Swiss-Prot record:
Residues 100-216, 350-381 form a coiled coil. This is Dynactin subunit 2. The keyword Lyase does not apply. It is found in: Cytoplasm, Cytoskeleton; Membrane. It is a peripheral membrane protein. Modulates cytoplasmic dynein binding to an organelle, and plays a role in prometaphase chromosome alignment and spindle organization during mitosis. It holds the Pfam family Dynamitin.
Length: 381
């Protein structure tokens, strides 16, 4: 029987039960297999490679200091941050050493420079973005050079650097021992590695000797090349060797004879200048001219621009002078016109006065004529 609370509602079947059960669907209609529509363009199909995904996230781990809340604050709250690689950092509560800081900064700068070079090679980037990348690359390169030229032995002491190097060497030895225990040693491989390591050590020793002889800083090399008048170090060495070849005994005799001839010529020139008697005043004037030229040397660079500007302003100055002349002529004509107007005004006042007087006389004569006409009319009657 239907619920009595629905008895006053319309369209309610009171003679039927309140609960209805649908029959169970067949298994053919409840299959979990989803048949895609291959020809439907509205469905976006993503082709994801499991191998590429595995290689992308291989060796990465998640940090535990995360915050997924949406609270507002000064600190930016992010989720998990995936990081890769092995870092030899200081432990929790331990202070980072200067050597660890230096190595970490070098590694980060190398990674940043690699990312910038990769982004510069991208063809989709605009010229402005590439220019900004180049500026950042230059700044990072200079910072890297400064970091490489930093002498830790002078800054923090040779003992601290030696202790850091000893700890690094001990860690390396422990890793080598663990590797030897885990993997069987191959004699051929170890021999080649020893040859390579000895060769690398020899090259590093030669590089160190070259840096000691020439200098590790690029400023010294550029100063040497600039003083020698060469573009690179090889040309500077060649020019220095050529100059050193001139200092041989055979060349020194030739140089001495040439210098003797030059001294004789200089003495003859001094005698001629003393004979003319124009030495004191002439040298004084030459010195004054030289001082004037020296003082006006910074203005010489601005003179071409000033001349060009004066040439461009010449037409404007001519137009201004013509305008001033026309304005003066206009003032003179205006003054003459004002004088003519004043004289015409006086003449007009005189004409008006004469016209008024003549009009008054005419009126008097007309009155007299009227009176005579009246008298004549009376006589005629």
């Amino acid at each position: 029987m239907a619920d009595p609370k629905f008895q006053f509602l319309p369209y309610i079947a009171h003679d039927q039960p309140d609960v209805y059960e649908t029959p169970d669907a067949p298994e053919s209609e409840t299959s979990d297999f989803y048949d895609e529509e291959p020809a439907n363009e509205s469905i976006e199909r993503l082709h994801i490679s499991t191998k590429d995904s595995y290689n992308k996230f291989k060796g990465k781990y998640l940090t535990g200091n995360v915050d997924f809340s949406d609270r507002i604050g000064k600190k930016i709250r992010n989720g998990y941050d995936a990081v890769s690689g092995e870092w030899d950092l200081a432990g929790e509560g331990e202070k980072e050493t200067p050597i660890q800081k230096c190595l970490r900064l070098q590694c980060e700068m190398n990674e940043l420079m690699e990312e910038i070079t990769a982004s510069q090679a991208d063809a989709t980037k605009t010229k402005e973005e590439k220019a900004s990348y180049e500026a950042v690359f230059d700044v990072v390169g200079t910072a890297k050079k400064v970091l490489e030229s930093l002498k830790l032995e002078q800054a923090i002491g040779s003992e601290t650097v030696a202790m850091g190097a000893e700890t690094e060497a001990k860690k390396l030895l422990t890793k080598i021992e663990e590797y030897k225990k885990s993997v069987g040693a191959d004699p051929a491989k170890t021999a080649t590695e020893l040859v390579y390591s000895s060769r690398i050590a020899e090259l590093e020793h030669r590089l160190h000797e070259l840096e000691v002889a020439v200098g590790a800083k690029p400023e010294k090399i550029s100063r040497l090349a600039g003083s020698a008048g060469a573009g690179n170090l090889i040309e500077a060495v060649q020019s220095i060797s050529a100059k050193a070849a001139l200092l041989q005994p055979q060349q020194l005799d030739l140089i001495e004879t040439r210098l003797g001839n030059l001294l004789l010529k200089m003495a003859a020139i001094d005698e001629k200048s003393a004979a003319t008697g124009q030495d004191a005043n002439r040298e004084q004037k030459i010195l004054e001219l030289y001082e004037i030229a020296k003082t006006t040397e910074p203005i010489v660079q601005i003179l071409p621009d000033m001349l060009n500007r004066m040439q461009t302003l010449e037409s404007l100055h001519k137009y201004a002078t013509n305008f001033s002349k026309l304005f003066a002529e206009l003032e003179t004509t205006q003054a003459s016109i004002l004088k003519g107007i004043a004289s015409n005004k006086t003449l007009l006042t005189g004409v008006q006065e004469a016209f008024a007087q003549n009009l008054e006389n005419v009126n008097k004569e007309v009155k007299k004529l009227d009176e005579r006409m009246k008298t004549l009319q009376e006589k005629v009657k």
